[in-house]
């Protein structure tokens, strides 16, 4: 199964990242990194709801996004809208102008109830507004499966943020279900326990401009 980037609804004019050749990431990180949400939207986080939370890890090496309603399910009666939901978040990133970051990998946390023959997948597209490049992560699990999960994937390539103190960073994440058994059922939803969200941890690499 392949993740179709088109189904995340990104027009070519919204394309992604700053196309700069890969370099060895720096071991140091900036002492400041803040996020301000510009907007969010999608079937899994309508723009008029407060269903997305985000923060920067204390070491500035990851961004954590928590989704309250990023869920998908499949059975004999579900529609395509039930079987896939997405959430696009546009963040204003502010930091030091002599550093750039790139998405290195993503880890997804949630809860799955999957019969045999059912597959659930997470995928994300990352890009910086005004740049013509993008990166993505995509990973999944197959049934039979019950309980909380952790799924990891490395970014398919490095795209680096602009050298500047503030810039828009876009993350479009979806969850989807597929099945090769018409009688099977499946659901990917919020993690069981106190956290109670679908969580995405975006690991960052840094380098100096």
From Swiss-Prot:
Question: Where do the segments described as Disordered lie?
Answer: 171-195
Q: Name one Pfam family in it.
A: DUF4360
What's the superkingdom here?
Eukaryota
* Disulphides: none
Q: Which UniProt keywords apply?
A: Glycoprotein, Secreted, Signal
Q: Where is the signal peptide?
A: 1-19
GO cellular component, alphabetical, reads:
extracellular region
Localization, UniProt: Secreted
**In its keyword annotation, does this UniProt entry include Glycoprotein?**
yes
Say if the entry is tagged with keyword Signal: yes
**Coiled-coil residues:** none
Q: What is this protein called?
A: Uncharacterized secreted protein ARB_00107
Native source species: Arthroderma benhamiae (strain ATCC MYA-4681 / CBS 112371) (Trichophyton mentagrophytes)
Source organism phylogeny = Eukaryota, Fungi, Dikarya, Ascomycota, Pezizomycotina
């Amino acid at each position: 199964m392949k993740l179709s980037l088109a189904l995340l609804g990104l027009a070519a004019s919204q394309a992604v990242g700053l196309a700069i050749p890969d370099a060895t990431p720096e071991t140091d990180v900036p002492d400041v990194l803040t996020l301000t949400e510009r907007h969010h939207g999608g079937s899994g986080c309508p723009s008029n709801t407060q269903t997305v939370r985000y923060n920067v890890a204390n070491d500035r090496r990851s961004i954590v996004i928590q989704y309250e309603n990023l869920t998908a399910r499949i059975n004999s009666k579900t529609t395509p809208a039930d079987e896939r939901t997405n959430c696009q978040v546009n963040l204003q990133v502010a930091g030091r102008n002599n550093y750039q970051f790139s998405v290195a990998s993503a880890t997804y946390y949630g809860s799955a109830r999957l019969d045999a023959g059912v597959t659930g997948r997470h995928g994300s597209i990352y890009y910086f507004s005004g740049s013509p490049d993008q990166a993505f992560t995509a990973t999944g699990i197959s049934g039979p499966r019950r309980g909380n999960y952790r799924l990891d994937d490395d970014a398919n390539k490095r795209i680096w943020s602009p050298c500047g103190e503030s810039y828009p960073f876009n993350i479009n994440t979806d969850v989807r279900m597929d099945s090769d058994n018409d009688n099977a059922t499946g659901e990917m939803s919020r993690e069981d326990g106190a956290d109670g969200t679908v969580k995405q941890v975006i690991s960052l690499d840094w380098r100096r401009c």
